[in-house]
Amino acid sequence: FFQAEDGIRDTSVTGVQTCALPIYSQMHPKKGLRHSPISGVVLTNGDVDHVAGLLTLRERQNLSVYAHSRVHSVLKENSIFNVLNSDYVDRREMKMNVEFELKNKEGKGSGIFVEAFEVPGKIALWLEDESKGANFGTQEGDTIGLKISSASNEKSFYYIPACAKMTSELSEKLKDSELVLFDGTLWKNDEMASSKVGEKTGQRMGHMNNSGPDGSIEAFKDLNVKKKIFIHINTTNPILLSDSSERKIVEENNWEVSYDGMEITI
């Protein structure tokens, strides 16, 4: 979340490494060369593409970082994250299934409320330990989703950038919701191998595929979600191509494909 000109009330749901780039006018410095309007960050897992951008948010600007205790412990154990000077950066633990208001370093409320919850997934790639069996040492809190609401609770949406499967508990949570931003990593489970860019399947990486009977398109069919948008999309995924047959299938099933700078109103 970041400081808009008329208050701390805006959210960006891109990866932290993207948030740190000056691609949106709202994120440009407002008070000098080193000012950052970014007031805080919420982490949903410890993967590199979710935490690496923290290293660019270290220019002695006040910041609050929210995460599960599991992810905070990972950051604490890796000394490179000590560049986040504790004089300026508050590391705040998120309790699961408890709604709270996002606040800046000084404790000023943002008017944005978040409820974090666990979703099926796995440990961050760089923390995997093959000696610990099929789950590679996955622990509680390694993968979470967020429900993000306005202060009045009149509007809310879900942000789930990684999800290994749709459970009955998760489908019940998402049912009849206004907006869901969901893991769109791969079209097919074996996409990395068939594209000759890697060997791991989507399931091995902790991601549902979009297509097929066990895919996210099928999983959402009866959930009556008003607006569904794929995020966290791998470069191999053909839904990125506006003229592909896969994109056509996505759109026929009332899904949208996210893009840089996308703005959504609910």
Positions of the model-derived regions?
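Histidine-anchored nucleotide/phosphate-binding helix
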Residues: 51-58, 216-217
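Active-site metal-binding loops of divalent metal-dependent hydrolases
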Residues: 12, 16, 46, 119-123, ...
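Short active-site oxyanion
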Residues: 39-40, 60-64, 156-157, 227
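Single conserved hydrophobic/aromatic residue that forms the stacking wall/gate
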Residues: 1-19
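Short internal beta-strands
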Residues: 63-72, 181-183, 230-231
